Regions:
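Active-/binding-site microenvironments in catalytic and ligand-binding cores
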Residues: 1-177
């Protein structure tokens, strides 16, 4: 009845790290907003993309615009449990964001927690990985320059035995042919 052990960064399946990319543009969502499955579905419809298993989905929040400034850790929306499961239930296994975290900025989550005292809202996007494991990348740059799709993402992680995280040089690859 115990929890299964979370996979570590050295166990990342490398075949999942060079895949077609999809960008969700959530820059218009307010700081601290928790994106839902409906938000993801609406954005996919807007850009005309049908998710495929192993697509790499990156989320463009407004946080990337203020990277390196004090407000960075308070900026951008986050991906909630429901939004994360929407992706992973459809076979997505690698995701990324330009924000400090996949989840809503913690300063906003702390305010919501003070009002509700609901522990389920803390790191809810991260914890969705307990149901369907996935890999996430944070603090990505230049997402605003990407189209919604039509590119591949390469994101091989540095292999650190037993680590819960690691570094990756993430690049978008376009076929000019």
């Amino acid at each position: 009845h115990g929890r299964r052990r979370a996979p570590t960064i050295d166990e990342t399946p490398l075949d999942q790290c060079l895949r077609p990319g999809v960008k969700l543009d959530f820059r218009a969502l307010p700081d601290g907003y928790v994106a839902t499955a409906a938000d993801v579905e609406a954005e996919l419809k807007r850009i005309g993309h049908a998710l495929q298993p192993y697509d790499i989905v990156v989320v463009n929040t407004r946080a990337g615009e203020v990277f390196g400034k004090p407000e960075f850790i308070h900026s951008g929306c986050g991906m909630g449990r429901e939004a994360t499961l929407y992706l992973t239930e459809r076979g997505v296994r690698v995701v990324g964001t330009d924000a400090w975290s996949w989840d809503a900025p913690f300063s906003h989550t702390a305010k919501r927690w003070a009002e509700t005292r609901d522990p389920k809202i803390i790191w809810e996007g991260h914890r969705a990985g307990r149901e369907i494991p996935y890999w996430q990348m944070e603090k990505l740059s230049n997402l605003a320059s990407l189209p919604p799709d039509g590119f591949e993402i390469c994101c091989f992680p540095v292999k650190i035995k037993g680590a819960s995280a690691g570094w990756s040089r993430v690049v978008a690859i376009f076929d000019d042919g």
